[in-house]
Structures are given as C-alpha cells and as structure tokens.
A protein has these predicted regions:
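A surface-exposed beta-strand-loop module
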Residues: 2-55, 112-113, 118
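Residues that cap or initiate secondary-structure elements
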Residues: 3, 13, 30-32, 41-45, ...
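Hydrophobic helix-coil surface modules that form long, contiguous segments used
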Residues: 77-166
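Beta-strand-rich interaction surfaces with strong enrichment in secreted/lumenal proteins
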Residues: 14, 23-28, 71-76, 104-107
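Glycine/proline-rich low-complexity spacer/linker segments in large multi-domain proteins
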Residues: 20-22, 38-88, 135-144
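Short, solvent-exposed loop/turn motifs
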Residues: 8, 13-14, 59, 104, ...
C-alpha cells in the first residue's frame, strides 16, 4: 500500500491533485514540468514479488509488467519514458551493496554506519525497466570487449551461495 508523503512540481509543493485508492490525479499542470513524488510503502510486507519487496534479507524490484505502481504513483505504461536518478541509503552492515539502473555517480559514507549510492540512468526508460537491488551480494566480474573495440566491465551480482552458478 502506498502512502503519499509529498508532491512537488518544479520544486514547489503542489496541492492541485486528487488521491484515490489506486491513482493520483494531478490538475492544472504546466505543459512542461519536473515532478517529484515522495511516498512510503512497506516492502517487508509485500509478498506479491511485484514492486519493491524483500527476499532472503535483500531488497529487490520486479516492475514488469505493472509492478512499478506498487512503488510510487506513476504513468506506468511502456510509452512513458523517464530518466531515473536513484539515491539508495542503508545500513552498510546489512546492505553493503546498493545497485540501480545506469551509472554510479556518487558513493558516500554516512554517520551511524550507513552509506549511500546515487545512480543516474542517462537513457529514458519505461517504468517496467526500473531496478533496485540491495543487500549482501557477491560479484563475478569480467572485462569484455565490445564489437567497437571498447573495453567494458561486466558484473554479475548474486547471493554468495549462488556465485558458483554464474
């Protein structure tokens, strides 16, 4: 279940909306705008394996085909493309790995044994491709060469017990 905490349009609190059981309807919007929606949900109680959920102590998202609407209010359809910037913050002991789509642009060590990672995806995507994975994971890494000759780092993240399966 989603709980709307705040809604901002172009950096200003926005009050021209209706909140219904399964939708948020915005009114009187400019033709172009930046929208920021802050909401809360409970992934620990999400047993549908859709949206944001917990499995084996790790957080995962499964957004295809309609899971993103369990994470936040959104036009959750494949023709709506969005640039996602995601900041994940967690207790480092419990969630040492913080992953999302795109490029890792910032990592921070915070007080009280917490840390954060900010990911920026430079390519517009439909919401069903949004991804978050956090937890205690192991990585298999390999440098690969693309057809154009560029070297890229390939990483496959799994639970430690599954590393030999990769």
């Amino acid at each position: 279940d989603l709980e709307l905490l705040s809604l901002h349009v172009d950096g200003q609190a926005y009050r021209h909306f209706e909140l219904h059981a399964k939708e948020l309807v915005l009114h009187d919007l400019p033709s172009a705008f930046d929208l920021e929606i802050t909401c809360s949900n409970n992934p620990l109680q999400n047993t549908s394996l859709m949206g944001l959920y917990v499995s084996s102590g790790n957080f995962f998202t499964q957004c295809e085909a309609e899971g993103f609407r369990k994470i936040t209010y959104f036009l959750d359809q494949p023709d709506v493309l969005t640039l996602f910037t995601v900041k994940l913050t967690a207790a480092k002991k419990d969630y040492p790995i913080l992953l999302s789509n795109g490029n890792l642009i910032q990592e921070e060590e915070l007080s009280d044994d917490r840390h954060s990672a900010t990911w920026e995806d430079p390519f517009p995507k439909p919401s069903y491709l949004f991804a978050i994975v956090t937890g205690k994971l192991a990585v298999l890494e390999k440098i690969i060469t693309t057809q154009s000759g560029k070297e890229k780092l390939l990483q496959i993240w799994v639970e430690e017990k599954d590393l030999s399966k990769t």
